[in-house]
Amino acid sequence: MRRFIAWMLVAGALVVTGCSSGPSPHPHFKIGQPYKINGNWYHPEFVTEYEAIGIASWYGSPYHGRLTANGELYDMYALTAAHPTLQLPSVVRVTNLANGRSLVLRVNDRGPFVDDRLIDLSLAAARELGFERQGLARVHVVYLGTARLDEKPIRPGERREYASLSCQLPTPERLVC
């Protein structure tokens, strides 16, 4: 009888853990300390202005559903991006210089850490900007503001804007609108 009860407890525990979901999101503002990856140093900082031209890449299914650097769940079907140094979450405008397509994206992750790439986009963002198949594109990135924690990333086709864009720029001491 004791063995039966023990087996039932083990089976019950397996059923409960088998039904558990992935990581729980806990979004938070993040700047972070300097860090080194693949021999390169990155120095995150709070900015009120940022503009750069460089190479964008995209990342997808291996990271879908995992926690981002600021504690949100990565959704490869949302319009998001990863940047090595901008405060998280941020809002940027990314323009594909080859075709002129432009998107406003939520930056909620760190990366890319390959070669001299400037920004990593979600699969949805790469599709919208027209470089999913090529994998890389030369882009212009402009910082628009700090994103709010209570906003979810926008998906293609949604008709809304980030509320943070109507806010005044926050200070490093107060990262909320």
Predicted regions and their residues:
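Sec-dependent bacterial lipoprotein signal peptides
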Residues: M1-C19
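Secreted/periplasmic proteins
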Residues: C19-C177
